[in-house]
Regions:
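Interaction interfaces in information-processing and related assembly proteins
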Residues: 1-230
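Cys/His-clustered metal-coordination modules, chiefly Zn-binding fingers
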Residues: 198-296
């Protein structure tokens, strides 16, 4: 299991949220058979979505992030609740790309930077809250920093890092960080935090070296007072059920269900988020056809 921590810095003038999520990223890699670059791309997206979801208030609230960068990896979709559970998928999970000029996984090229980032908060109201911003780099962290500034009017420092073993492709570490100064935060504090960017970029490396999340944060922001206010366990968890897939089939309507019965004599649906397959026999489809008729 991973963990999310929340806290305050610099005499309570700066909000801090961080995550260690090796298991989240590795579970996603295993479920989707991800290439190394897609492990990094989806992993980063899962980490930021999980942190944002943890800020939701209601037990049934959901937050979904949709990255449409226009790159060959396709769209990335992740959903989280406020209890640390997150799930997600990437459209082209097997994509392989050469390393970038720095010798690192070319996440930016895989994701693309010509599209849009969308955040959907479903708070159980009549309509969900939807925020959007343009992609700026495809590195994901920079794109979410842009989103916080443009869509939520909250300047933020965002870091996301996933360390992937170059030999077997397994995840060695995953870490994320959101730092947000409050409106009354002094300029010198903001400057001090911005000076820590080189250290911030070492977070995944520290986690890979076995340094605990809180200790890593204190090392990064050494000299700035820090108080941790909350900690939460996290994990990759899909909440798909057979009943939910039945409702999907019913929603297709009588004509399409009848077509499945006549031509396919059954149906097999696959959950995008966890790749679990659900098979429905011809008789089961006939039962759903009856329910679809009652619903009309």
């Amino acid at each position: 299991m991973g963990r999310i921590v929340r806290g305050l810095m610099a005499n309570d003038t700066v909000k801090l949220m961080a995550i260690t999520g090796k298991d989240i990223c590795e579970t996603a890699r295993e479920l989707h058979g991800l290439s190394r670059v897609c492990t990094a791309a989806l992993g980063r997206s899962l980490l930021i979505t999980d942190m944002m979801g943890a800020q939701l208030k209601g037990e049934n609230d959901k937050l979904t992030t949709i990255i449409k960068g226009g790159g060959p990896a396709g769209n990335i979709v992740c959903t989280a609740d406020n209890r640390g559970h997150v799930k997600g998928y990437i459209e082209n999970p097997k994509l392989e790309l050469p390393l970038n000029d720095s010798g690192k996984l070319n996440v930016s090229m895989a994701v693309g930077w010509f599209g849009e980032l969308t955040v959907v908060r479903d708070l159980g109201l009549k309509e969900p809250y939807v925020g959007k911003s343009n992609m700026v780099s495809g590195e994901i962290a920079e794109d979410f920093a842009q989103y916080f500034t443009v869509s939520e009017q909250q300047p933020s420092m965002v870091y996301l890092g996933v360390r992937v073993d170059p030999h077997d492709g397994k995840v060695r570490a995953g870490g994320g960080l959101i730092v947000q100064p409050m409106p009354f935060c002094p300029d010198d504090v903001i400057d001090n935090i911005q000076d820590r960017v080189p250290m911030v970029k070492m977070l995944a490396g520290m986690l890979d070296d076995g340094i605990e999340l809180e200790a890593s944060l204190k090392k990064i922001f050494d000299g700035i007072d820090m108080t941790f206010t909350e900690t939460m366990e996290t994990g990759f968890r899909c909440d798909c059920t057979r009943e939910r897939l039945e409702r999907v089939l019913i929603s297709l309507g009588r004509d399409e269900l009848s077509d499945m019965i006549e031509k396919e004599h059954g149906a097999e649906l696959t959950c995008h988020f966890c790749n679990k397959k659900y098979s429905f026999s011809e008789d089961e489809l006939k039962g759903l056809l009856e329910e679809a008729g009652k619903a009309q």
